[in-house]
C-alpha cells in the first residue's frame, strides 16, 4: 500500500491549507470511463467543514493524474458532509449525498457548477419514528440517538433513476434523474417526483449490477441483500465478518467487493470502549446471475 496520489496530498494536519490535500476522504468511486472520483467532505468528526476545503476530485486511472477538482463553497454550508457519489459519464453529471443536513448535490461536470436540491424533503431526512437497533441496543453516540440523513446513493445502469436513502432508517427512495438535472424546474415539482419505495434494509452504501439488481448491506444483521428490478428484497449472504458493510465496487468479471467500516464498534457508540478488530478487511464474492 502507498499514499494516493502522493505523499503531499496525504500530508494534511490541522492548520494546513486543505484545498489541495485530503482532509478526510469519505468515498471513492470508479465510473464507466475508468476515472476515479474521490469525495473529501473536509469535515473532521462530521462537525464543521475545514477552511472551505470540501471537494470532489477526478483522477484519470490510466495516468493517475488529477483531471478536475470540483468545489462547493457557495453551495454547501460549513455543517455539510458530502458522503457518497455516483457519476453519469454519458450525461456528464455527478450526484452526491449530504448526510449531515440532508440533500442531493447535482454537479454539471461540463460547466463545473453545482446545486443542492431536495434539502427540505422528508426523503433526505431520518425518519423520526424509526428506532435504530444495532448489536441488540439502540444506536447512540455519547448517550444520544444517532440520526443521520441522506447517505447511500446508487444510479441505475441506464442513468435514468437515482436511488438514495438516509443512513439511520430503513426507507428507500428514488427519483428520475431528469428532475434533478433540470435547473429550471420549480422545487415543488421536483419534490413531487420523489417516489417512496417503502421499508427495506438499514444500509450504508449500495450499488447496482448490470442487470439492475440493487445490492445493499444490512448492517443490523451482518448481511448483504439485494433488491430486484421488481423491487423484491432477497438475501444474498449473511456472515459475521460483515460488520457494517459500507461501500462497494463491482468488477467486470462479476465480483462484488465490500469494505466493512465497523462503525458500530467505535468508542463513540460503545461508552468509550473500542470494539473494533484489526486489520480492516475488504471482502469479495462472486455475484449470482452475472
Give the residues covered by each predicted segment:
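Short loop/turn segments immediately following beta-strands, especially the blade-tip
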Residues: 109-114, 121-123, 174-186, 287-290
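Beta-rich, blade/repeat-based domains predominating
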Residues: 13-39, 75-94, 124-161, 169, ...
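Conserved beta-strand positions in repeat-built beta-propeller and related beta-rich domains
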Residues: 38-42, 96-100, 156, 164-167, ...
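Beta-propeller fold detector
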Residues: 1-14, 67-71, 115-130, 182-198, ...
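Short, solvent-exposed loop/turn segments at conserved positions within beta-propeller repeat blades
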Residues: 47-54, 99-100, 167-168, 220, ...
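Beta-propeller blade signature
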Residues: 52-64, 107, 112, 272-289
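Blade-level signature of beta-propeller repeat domains, shared across WD40, Kelch, NHL, RCC1
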Residues: 249-290
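Asp-box/WD-like beta-propeller blade repeats and closely related beta-sheet repeat scaffolds
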Residues: 22, 43-44, 49-93, 97, ...
Amino acid at each position: 500500500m502507498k499514499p494516493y496520489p502522493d505523499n503531499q496530498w496525504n500530508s494534511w494536519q490541522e492548520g494546513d491549507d486543505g484545498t489541495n490535500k485530503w482532509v478526510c476522504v469519505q468515498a471513492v468511486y470508479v465510473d464507466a470511463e475508468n476515472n476515479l472520483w474521490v469525495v473529501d467532505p473536509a469535515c473532521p468528526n462530521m462537525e464543521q467543514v475545514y477552511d472551505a476545503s470540501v471537494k470532489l476530485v477526478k483522477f484519470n486511472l490510466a495516468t493517475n493524474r488529477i483531471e478536475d477538482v470540483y468545489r462547493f463553497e457557495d453551495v454547501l454550508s460549513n455543517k455539510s458532509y458530502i458522503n457518497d457519489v455516483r457519476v453519469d459519464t454519458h450525461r456528464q453529471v455527478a450526484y452526491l449525498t449530504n448526510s449531515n443536513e440532508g440533500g442531493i448535490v447535482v454537479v454539471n461536470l461540463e460547466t463545473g457548477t453545482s446545486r443542492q436540491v431536495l434539502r427540505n424533503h422528508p426523503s433526505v431526512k431520518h425518519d423520526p419514528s424509526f428506532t435504530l437497533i444495532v448489536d441488540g441496543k439502540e444506536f447512540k453516540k455519547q448517550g444520544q440517538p444517532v440520526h443521520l440523513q441522506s447517505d447511500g446513493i446508487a444510479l441505475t445502469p441506464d442513468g435514468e433513476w437515482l436511488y438514495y436513502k438516509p443512513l439511520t432508517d430503513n426507507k428507500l427512495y428514488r427519483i428520475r434523474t431528469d428532475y434533478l438535472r433540470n435547473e429550471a424546474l420549480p422545487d415543488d415539482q421536483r419534490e413531487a417526483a420523489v417516489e417512496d419505495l417503502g421499508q427495506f434494509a438499514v444500509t450504508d452504501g449500495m450499488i447496482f449490477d448490470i442487470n439492475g439488481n440493487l445490492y445493499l448491506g444490512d448492517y443490523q444483521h451482518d448481511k448483504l441483500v439485494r433488491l430486484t428490478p421488481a423491487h423484491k428484497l432477497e438475501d444474498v449472504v449473511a456472515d459475521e465478518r460483515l460488520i457494517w458493510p459500507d461501500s462497494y465496487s463491482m468488477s467486470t468479471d462479476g465480483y462484488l467487493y465490500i469494505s466493512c467500516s465497523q462503525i458500530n464498534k467505535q468508542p463513540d457508540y460503545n461508552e468509550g470502549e473500542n470494539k473494533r478488530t484489526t486489520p480492516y478487511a475488504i471482502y469479495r464474492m462472486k455475484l449470482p446471475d452475472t
